[in-house]
């Protein structure tokens, strides 16, 4: 899955990243490159939390859906790619390990 992100910079701050399709998911970095890396990690952590809680995964919208939103005016648009199948396997493995530690299995 590819989630659109918007990178923004205020004069007195580092580069901030917002993920419009994942409410409350944000990140930052000192450079654009660092912001992109941190954004990918933030999206992965956000989705991992949803999977652990058995919550639905929001489908990403096309960037063009968000570009007309005035909240994101002047931002740099990119996408981050997440291998949802691999993440789901990792979460399933974590759940099994957690259950075995409390002798449920």
Segments (PLM) and residue ranges:
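Short, charged/polar surface micro-motifs in flexible loops or helix N-caps
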Residues: 22-23, 84
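Short glycine-enriched loop/turn motifs at secondary-structure junctions
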Residues: 19-21, 90-91
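N-terminal segment of the canonical double-stranded RNA-binding domain
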Residues: 1-14, 18
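Short, charged, surface-exposed hinge/linker loops at domain edges
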Residues: 1-2, 41-105
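A short, exposed loop/beta-hairpin motif centered on an aromatic-Gly-Thr core
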Residues: 23-34
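Conserved anionic group-binding/transfer micro-motifs
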Residues: 35, 39
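A generic "binding-loop/recognition-motif" signal
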Residues: 13, 22, 103
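Short aromatic/hydrophobic contact patches that present stacked aromatics
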Residues: 16, 26, 96
């Amino acid at each position: 899955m590819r989630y659109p992100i918007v990178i923004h910079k205020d004069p007195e701050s580092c580069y901030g990243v917002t993920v419009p399709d994942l409410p409350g998911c944000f990140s930052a970095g000192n450079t654009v490159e660092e912001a992109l890396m941190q954004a990918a990690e933030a999206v992965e952590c956000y989705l991992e939390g949803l999977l652990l809680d058995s919550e639905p995964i929001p489908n990403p919208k096309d960037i063009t859906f968000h570009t007309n939103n005035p909240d994101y005016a002047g931002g740099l648009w990119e996408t981050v790619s997440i291998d949802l199948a691999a993440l789901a396997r990792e979460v399933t493995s974590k759940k099994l390990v957690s259950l075995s530690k409390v002798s449920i299995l």
